[in-house]
Amino acid sequence: MKVAVLLGGTSSERPVSLVSGEAAIEALREKGHDVTPIDVGPDIATTIASLKAAAPDVVFNALHGPRGEDGAIQGVLEWLGLPYTHSGIRASAVAMDKGATRILLAAAGLPVAQGRVVTVEELAEADPLPAPYVIKPVAEGSSVGVEIVRTGDNRRAEIARTWRFGKEALVESFIPGRELTAGVMGDRALAVTDILPSETAAFYDFEAKYKAGGSRHVVPAELPQAVTDRALDYALRAHQTLGCQGASRTDFRYDEGTDTLVILEVNTQPGMTPTSLLPEQAAYCGISYPELCDWMVREALAR
């Protein structure tokens, strides 16, 4: 079939999207599809013209970050009447808003860390939570802008002064322990991965995610079966609660000392290089990377 692959974009995650998109293009061509790459820039009219010229049967969305996974490009594709992979407008917009995601997940009985959305002015005045706590942009991905304020740390006011991610921030209690993630394909939770940042990484930040040697992935995670089952259940329920479609990935923190497992976020546009977390989990389940990409476009077309 004719597939247009959207990649690039204008967010801070553009380099990640380019890698994901190029890998998907190669995989889809391997599966026999007629693929047209479309590098999405700041001019949406140019993107629309490229989509109309390509006249695809389906669009593979390999964009990340604002405008790519927040419902914006999804709205354009809906307006054009083009089927597309991953989640729709509402789920994409909600999942991109970490504050809104927290509210919906908690209402569904799913575990989230103690926290709230604060203004930058509030953050500048006083600690919003007892340290240690995490400060996150409300609408960024790939751990862009994430800061950890630890006990005795005097960086809070400076973080607020130099904040460049809007007028608000999400603050959450820091959960010690392990970084876990679980992917979902349709109505199936795949596997749980244990993410081990390098010894030089403070946490699983942008460099740990994308720099060579920045982290190591262990799939399946070496966990008690009950914890694995809980993570898989939470990932599928989070996918369903937000109304996600296609593939998603839910990230967790797990404190072994207290047996506490909390959801950090739900990714409606998970990384899609062959060595990204979701494709690794699919491979563990016997689904090759080309088969995963092929499933995504066929699932989108069948909705």
From Swiss-Prot:
ATP binds at residues 128-181. Keywords: ATP-binding, Cell shape, Cell wall biogenesis/degradation, Cytoplasm, Ligase, Magnesium, Manganese, Metal-binding, Nucleotide-binding, Peptidoglycan synthesis. It is found in: Cytoplasm. It comes from the Bacteria. Mg(2+) 1 binds at residues 251, 265. It holds the Pfam family Dala_Dala_lig_C. Its cofactor is Mg(2+); Mn(2+). Binds 2 magnesium or manganese ions per subunit. InterPro entries: ATP-grasp, ATP_grasp_subdomain_1, D-Ala_lig_Van_CS, D_ala_D_ala, Dala_Dala_lig_C, Dala_Dala_lig_N, PreATP-grasp_dom_sf. Cell wall formation. This is D-alanine--D-alanine ligase.
